[in-house]
Amino acid sequence: MRRTLVLVRHGQSEWNIKNLFTGWKDPDLTEKGRTEAITAGKNLKKAGLKFDIAYTSALQRAQKTAQHILEQMAQPDLQLIKNSALNERDYGDLSGLNKDDARQRWGQEQVHIWRRSYTIAPPNGESLRDTGARVWPYYFHHIQPHILRSQTVLIVAHGNSLRALIMVLEGLSSEEIVLQELATGVPIIYEFNADSTILSKKIIQS
């Protein structure tokens, strides 16, 4: 019996190309982002996958990516559960700011610490650990039970919420996880053993 989880970071958003801190702000996908999502769906269909249930965040860039993926897989009516527990990390006072402007205001080193530290949050925002504190319970209580019942599950979310999830799935340290980079619109496929250990991991590049 297959126990499969597919993770996809949303396609490129309008704020990605403007070099802005996005966080819980809600910009739409760019045309490139829509193409990335469509390509992801085609590649997942080509890989022979069919989802039993799908999860996404409360933000439209993730929701629309999920919808494009499911349309390409001929599953447009599949149940898509939306929850803010899967939202991007909240960047607090950095949200909406240009990253270069933020470096000028607070200094390059401080901004780098806020972006890449596991425990240090920007003013009025979340650290990666804070993000994990909402992602992990939601995954274990709501999503993992489907996988353990040998279902195939899709999660479309964000760079940091997925990074936090990958940390627990792969047993990575706080030092290792902050170095992980996730490309937009690129599916990561995990197969699990009955005891929830990873049997295989595959990244589908277009």
Curated annotation (Swiss-Prot):
Keywords, alphabetical: Gluconeogenesis, Glycolysis, Isomerase
The EC category is isomerase
Record site: Transition state stabilizer: H158
Against SUPFAM superfamilies, the record matches this protein to:
Phosphoglycerate mutase-like (SSF53254)
Catalytic activity, as annotated: (2R)-2-phosphoglycerate = (2R)-3-phosphoglycerate
Presence of the UniProt keyword Isomerase in the record: yes
Q: In which pathway does it act?
A: Carbohydrate degradation; glycolysis; pyruvate from D-glyceraldehyde 3-phosphate: step 3/5
* Keyword Isomerase recorded: yes
- Which residues does the annotation say bind substrate? 9-16, 22-23, 61, 88-91, 99, 115-116, 159-160
Under InterPro entries, the record lists: His_Pase_superF_clade-1 (IPR013078), His_PPase_superfam (IPR029033), PG/BPGM_mutase_AS (IPR001345), Phosphogly_mut1 (IPR005952)
Residue stretches spanning the membrane = none
Any GO BP: gluconeogenesis
- Assembly and interaction partners: Homodimer.
Q: Which NCBIfam families match?
A: pgm_1, PRK01295.1
Q: Main role? A: Catalyzes the interconversion of 2-phosphoglycerate and 3-phosphoglycerate.
Membership in a protein family: Belongs to the phosphoglycerate mutase family. BPG-dependent PGAM subfamily.
* Name the UniProt record assigns to this protein: 2,3-bisphosphoglycerate-dependent phosphoglycerate mutase
Please name the source species: Bartonella bacilliformis (strain ATCC 35685 / KC583 / Herrer 020/F12,63)
Give the source lineage, highest ranks first: Bacteria, Pseudomonadati, Pseudomonadota, Alphaproteobacteria, Hyphomicrobiales
